[in-house]
């Protein structure tokens, strides 16, 4: 074989591989960002949707496997985890004339929201302790010092909230954080992702 051809084939191969996320990471569609102040105050939602059914992708830590178990993702997740708001408005609407059913649905929703929000908050606090110098994480930690009601009060003032609520079942309806003044979202900052050594070595090679 012609050495130049072989080199070209190798080069093309590396080019293709260069687009694969490093182990431990994945490209994730994230439809909405909570923009927080450095003090952890909710400022606004940032809409990252592109067209009708897609959103911008970010390179974040690989998602956790959960069939029905409660397990939080790394600084991003669905509304039940990040906002303590479950996508159950339709169920409530459907049962609104059946008092018993309605009560059951509301109870179920409430316990699901509490459990998932707590899992996400605990995860945020763990990450905060592991990376104590991160201003981003300090802000997110501060945000989660509020309870479910405070969070809902803050986000429901946002003009995007009604539209977000209607689209919670969409594939892109994942939420993450950007701190005001930062270009990157917190969940894609490599130095905060606590990749284990093998993942880190591969990440270095991928640069």
Which role fits each region the language model picked out?
Residues 1-207:
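Conserved phosphate-interacting/catalytic interface
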